[in-house]
């Protein structure tokens, strides 16, 4: 049996999971943090609750990869490098170019780097991870799995913005979405849990974490999603504003004395959302829920819930119906009250949540009542498994 490693490389981190394929068993997983900084943190979890952790300076991603592979051998998790038969890499932006996962060639890598303008915080880091593994394991197949690929099935009327069409034709200015690998996994898993072909289902998937997005999945294909040209659009998030009137930017820039539009975008990305609405209290939903006695925190919570309901309601219209609503990611999987508050405001189209079934954290469950016309599901996301599956598919 082959071993496949799924990689999520950040600018100063490397998150990974090692799978025994094709039986999809997680052999080990871990993260390298603070790459390029002093006191990098190197962690491997394996076996029956065993953990290896060391703090050491790690200069770059290639050093991190070499250290990871050597330590997997030292811990007898790998016998040699040769046991790894595939490496899958998360890549945030694939633009219109990549409609599916793809084997990474030099040409593909160049295109990934060229698409960095669509994801300047992510694609360059993803490319660093790819280069590091290809240098150390040059003969092993590498596969890029794009966050945006799942959304390339959106019809034109759902991905175009109402600006001059030439901006799309010249500059590819359009909605791309994000979290596609997560939405793909949980929609497929929901269909399996319901025992119905995904081709026959209309599903709304709610990926609710510090970043959050809602997707309409019709017959297994994404037909609309809340994130846009970048992951800044859509619902209210931990630190991101979600949808705002574009005219707000120049107005606030004038009031704040800003001259660089990127400074304003940074505020919308990093200082807004729940964090901004609570005057800097927190971007963490757990902190929000424990401070609902504060009026501004209650309002922030209400806005968070309201925006999600609005997107769900609009996607019922987009698909002319819905069979199931799925909750996933950190908030979606663990915040019992958030799920209840979202659904309690949407009983008008046949959603009924079962309070006992909903009292669950981080595990698969059908949480709707037996009489609910719309099935409600909790499905923990597993983007790493989807990456490993795509590597197997493309070998």
Curated annotation (Swiss-Prot):
Keywords: ATP-binding, Cytoplasm, Kinase, Magnesium, Metal-binding, Nucleotide-binding, Transferase. Mg(2+) binds at residues 8, 383. Its EC number is 2.7.2.1. Mg(2+). Can also accept Mn(2+). It is an enzyme of class 2 (transferase). GO terms for biological process: acetate metabolic process; acetyl-CoA biosynthetic process. Pathway: Metabolic intermediate biosynthesis; acetyl-CoA biosynthesis; acetyl-CoA from acetate: step 1/2. The keyword Glycoprotein does not apply. The active site is at 147 (proton donor/acceptor). The record marks 179, 240 as: Transition state stabilizer. Belongs to the acetokinase family. NCBIfam families: ackA. Catalyzes the formation of acetyl phosphate from acetate and ATP. Can also catalyze the reverse reaction. This is Acetate kinase. It comes from Enterococcus faecalis (strain ATCC 700802 / V583). The gene is ackA.
